[in-house]
Regions:
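P-loop potassium selectivity filter motif centered on the GYG triad
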Residues: 217, 223, 320-334, 424, ...
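Hydrophobic alpha-helical transmembrane segments
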Residues: 14-21, 322, 434-442
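Short capping/connector residues at structural and topological boundaries
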Residues: 203-205, 210, 257, 335-336, ...
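Hydrophobic alpha-helical transmembrane segments of multi-pass inner membrane proteins, especially
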Residues: 72-127, 132-314, 353-411, 438, ...
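A juxtamembrane structural motif centered on a specific transmembrane helix
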Residues: 61, 408-583
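TM-adjacent membrane-interface loops and short helices in multi-pass inner/ER membrane proteins
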Residues: 307-352, 362-363
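Transmembrane helix boundary and interhelical junction motifs in multipass membrane proteins
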Residues: 251-256, 331-335, 345-348, 416-419, ...
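Transmembrane alpha-helices
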Residues: 2-97, 113-118
Length: 583
């Protein structure tokens, strides 16, 4: 008996250190990937991350299976094997099918899903007989919904050619979103004081999770053009209708997410700090109004202020969450050694507390860093796009993702009042997992579309450059916007852009867009001769230039004097030229 106890303690202690080490290494590699420039090194890191994911799943599930006997143990072992086989094979398949995908983002998604699989399995399979009977099918449902979501992620990029047309469907997205929320408000049964879900074939869906995607698409489409006062007011009214319906449904967590996404996307589109300040003021007024109008908001604020005075009733949930986080310490109690099921609705609303109790504070910190890595990665993609529709959608998805994490972790740690939202990709909940995977799947689709267009243009440009060099062709100075004062050298990006800026390309070209040191998502038209896609998707290129070393190396005056690039500015064509030079 003593030997068995010793072996159990040894296995648990070893497991928690190994789990933390594996997860920490995976997260560190995700951050190091920002500095990787060589394709071979990048592929090697991807493979290492896949192996780490498999090792994490094997080690964590073996620890749980060590204490789960009988049919439940066999069920857990089989489920673990299916999870490993599916995730690893799917990561390889995604790389093969979508060679230009952002695989580090996809790897992060799969690792977060793995943490969720382990946590949900532990809660379901190891506990009281009553708890196991109640939650026994949750790990299987979680795996099924995650698998379906990943399959959608695989399929979505095949429709990338249609994404550009969605910028004209803003009203349609808004109408669909408002209609879906209104129907649920009218027909959904009340659950925990809110009317936000309905059940089909044993699966409970929360439509507001999917409406988030329509909502971001609606805002991106409506704000991708010129943001006039009239348009801003119109968009604000439609966004407010979404929020009001959610408030009427008592889904205040989702209402808060919708409002913050609207505010940040409008701020990005307008570029005005006054918009952000006005939005914050409006949000403060709304928070006070909610506190005065809704009794359950008052209860949650009172719980947040001092849950331990109400520990026997309303404060029990958050008090148990605080106990769990503090009890776990730095390294955690070890899988199966905590009491996560003592927290009501732990698998959906308090997953971060359960993970911190058994896997430790260090593991949870790295978990948050991995979530932050996803946010930074998506934000960097948004900043790299010149296409406003691409930029706004990606930015909205990033804000939606990180703000939901802030709400759930902040609520569980008593940093802010509870909102009842899930931890994306980790908490139990089919709607949450499916909608998050769909939202991030569109982010991947936009990235693939951008990379393909950039690669297609660069291939065409290199071919033209080689042809110009072979023929020793002079620069084309016809219709020179500078009246011949400043001309590109033969074969330079500007020479190529100016020579081909005809009707087949659909708009003006900027020097900034075709700098060899910068990539721009500005290639979407079809060349009349070859059918290849390259040319601007939109003609509203920025006219405020940036100073980059060497950006004027390809320029010279017609009398042979070199052009230094000092005191530069841009004209309405977007071309750089010396300050004071007239057209």
């Amino acid at each position: 008996m003593e030997l068995k106890y010793f072996m159990n303690a040894y296995a648990i202690s070893l497991s928690k250190y190994v789990n933390t080490g594996i997860f920490a290494l995976f997260t560190i590699l995700s951050y190091l990937s920002f500095t990787i420039r060589k394709k071979g090194v990048s592929r090697a890191v991807e493979i290492i991350q896949r192996l780490l994911l498999a090792a994490f799943l094997i080690n964590a599930n073996m620890t749980i299976a060590w204490f789960v006997r009988g049919a439940a143990g066999r069920k857990l072992t089989l489920l673990c094997a299916m999870e490993i086989l599916f995730l690893i094979s799917f990561m390889v398949l995604y790389r093969i099918v979508h060679e230009m995908a952002n695989m580090f983002l996809f790897n992060n998604i799969c690792m977060l899903l793995s943490v969720g699989f382990v946590a949900v399995s532990r809660i379901a399979f190891y506990g009281s007989a009553e708890s196991t009977a109640y939650r026994g099918n949750e790990p299987i449902k979680q795996f099924v919904m995650a698998s379906a979501g990943l399959m959608f992620m695989l399929v979505i990029p095949f429709f990338r050619k249609l994404f550009d047309s969605m910028r004209h469907m803003g009203i349609v997205f808004a109408a669909l979103g408002i209609a879906a929320l209104t129907v649920v408000l009218l027909i959904s049964p009340e659950t925990n004081g809110a009317t936000i879900t309905y059940t089909i074939a044993g699966f409970t869906f929360q439509p507001s999770e999917f409406v988030k995607i329509l909502y971001i698409l609606f805002l991106a489409a409506m704000l991708s053009g010129e943001v006039t006062v009239e348009r801003a007011v119109f968009v604000s009214i439609l966004a407010a209708i979404h929020v009001v319906v959610l408030v009427r449904s008592t889904d205040l967590g989702s209402a808060l997410i919708f409002f913050v996404v609207y505010l940040m996307m409008l701020f990005l589109a307008s570029g005005k700090w006054s918009v952000l300040a006005a939005g914050i003021a409006l949000g403060a007024v709304g928070a006070v109004a909610g506190l005065l109008l809704f009794y359950h908001v008052q209860v949650r604020v009172n719980i947040w202020r001092d849950p331990f005075t109400m520990i026997d009733n309303e404060g029990y949930q958050i008090a148990q969450s605080m106990f769990a986080i503090s009890y776990g310490g730095l390294w955690g109690t070890g899988l199966t050694q905590g009491l996560p099921t003592s927290i009501p609705d732990v698998e959906s609303d308090f997953m971060f507390s359960a993970i911190t109790e058994e896997m430790g504070l260090i593991f949870s910190v790295f978990l948050l860093f991995l979530c932050l890595n996803c946010f930074i990665r998506i934000l960097m993609l948004s900043a790299s796009y010149s296409n406003r529709f691409f930029q706004l959608y990606t930015y909205g998805a990033a804000v939606c993702y990180i703000f939901q994490i802030f709400l759930t972790v902040g609520g569980e740690t008593k940093f802010i009042p509870l909102t009842g939202v899930t931890l994306p990709l980790v908490s139990y909940g089919g709607s949450s997992i499916m909608s998050t995977l769909l939202m991030l799947g569109i982010v991947e689709m936009v990235y693939i579309l951008h990379e393909e267009r950039t690669a297609g243009f660069m291939q065409r440009y290199e071919q033209e450059q080689l042809q110009a060099e072979a023929a020793n062709a002079p620069a084309n100075v016809e219709d020179d916007p500078y009246n011949g004062a400043l001309v590109p050298s033969p074969g330079s990006p500007d020479s190529y852009a100016r020579d081909n800026a005809g009707p087949d390309f659909g708009g003006d070209f900027s020097r900034e867009s075709y700098s060899e040191d910068r990539t721009a998502d500005s290639f979407g038209q079809t060349h009349a001769d070859t059918g290849q896609e390259y040319g601007p998707e939109e003609d509203n290129f920025p006219v405020n230039g940036v100073s980059e070393e060497g950006i004027f190396d390809n320029y010279s005056y017609q009398d042979g004097r070199p052009f230094s690039g000092e005191d530069t500015k841009t004209d309405h064509y977007g071309f750089y030229r010396p300050d004071g030079m007239k057209k």
